[in-house]
Amino acid sequence: MFERTLFTEEHTLFRDAARRFMETEVQPNRERWEEQGYVDREVWLKAGAAGFLCPSMPEQYGGAGADKRYSTVLIEEQYRIGDSGLGFSLHSEIVAPYLLHYGSEHIKQTYLPKMASGEMIGAIAMTEPAAGSDLQGIKTTAVKQGAHWVLNGSKT
């Protein structure tokens, strides 16, 4: 076994808190969430209050401005308890960065703080009847007409 040198003492403290959260808030509820088909909103709010959502998001948008190693810690602790359906990493590491890098300032100010707090949950809606989740096969279009966008396509 080799010693990991990637993480600092701050990461270790964060890991301890993340581990406690996963063991007390996630693990006991996993089976129920699986049966009901969704994760309770309450755990998202608790995760946001604990700083476990969008940790690398800049502070001006509600995040901690932390480095990506904090996200790595969260993912490791989630998988340590055997969970893959929580959705925090999709929310924080895929959806939020899209908004951060490609959204207008209005979009960033409106949605990112709510995503960091757990008030809003990010998701990706990318499937179509003929394409499934193959992004290359998606036929939906968005065309700007004046001040508006016209969307054409179908959703599964």
Task: Show where each model-derived region lies.
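Buried hydrophobic positions in well-ordered alpha/beta secondary-structure cores of metabolic enzymes
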Residues: 11, 22, 51, 58, ...
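Glycine-rich, Trp-frequent "lid" loop and neighboring beta-strands that shape
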Residues: 63-64, 83, 106-156
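Internal helix-loop-helix
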Residues: 49-119
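Short, conserved alpha-helical segments within structured domains
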Residues: 39-40, 91
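C-terminal helix-coil-helix/basic helical segment that borders enzyme active sites and/or dimer interfaces
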Residues: 27-38
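Intrinsic disorder at enzyme termini
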Residues: 1-10, 142
